[in-house]
Amino acid sequence: RSLRDFSMNSVGVEVKTTSRDTSSHLVQGVHQVELADDEDGGVAETRLILVSIGLKAAEPGDDSFTIPQLVDRISSRLTEAGGHQLAEGFLTHVSEYGAGSGLGYDHRTMSADPMFAMPYVTKFFRGYDMTDPAIEVLRRDDIAGRHHVDVSSVRFRVDLPLAASAG
C-alpha cells in the first residue's frame, strides 16, 4: 500500500485534483479509496477522507496561484509552525510524488521552470467520507473473487457526486 497524502492519527486523507467540472479522478488502486489496515506496521484507519479539488486555468485578473507559489506558501507556513526541518520534509515529500512516472515536481530545482508557471484558480473543494456506503466505488472485495486479477494492478476513474450521504 502507498502512504496517504496526509494522516492524522487513524484518519487518512487522499487529495485528488481535477480540471473537470465534477469530482472525477483517476485512482491508482483500491488502496486509495479503502481504509488502511495495520498489516504494514502503520496505524489502522477508522476513517478515510478523499479531498477533491477542482482547478481551472486562471483568466487575467483572477486571484490565482501557480504550483511554485503554492509550495512556497505551504513551506513558509510549515517553517513558521514547526521549523525548517518540517518544511524540508514537505519539500522532499513533494519531490517524491510522481517522480517514478517522470512527472514529478522538485521545488528546489524546478520552481522557475516555465512548465509550472501556469496560474490556476480553485473551482471547488469537496471532502468525501470513503466509509460512507453512499460512495459506490470499486473495492478490494469486488475484485477478490476474480482469481486471475492482481488487485494491485487495477486502476480506475471515480466520478463522485456533488454530495453523498447514506444517512
Can you describe what each PLM-predicted range is?
Residues R1-S2, T18-G167:
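Nucleic-acid endonuclease domains
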Residues F6, V11-S19:
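Conserved catalytic cores of phosphodiester-cleaving nucleases, focusing on short active-site segments
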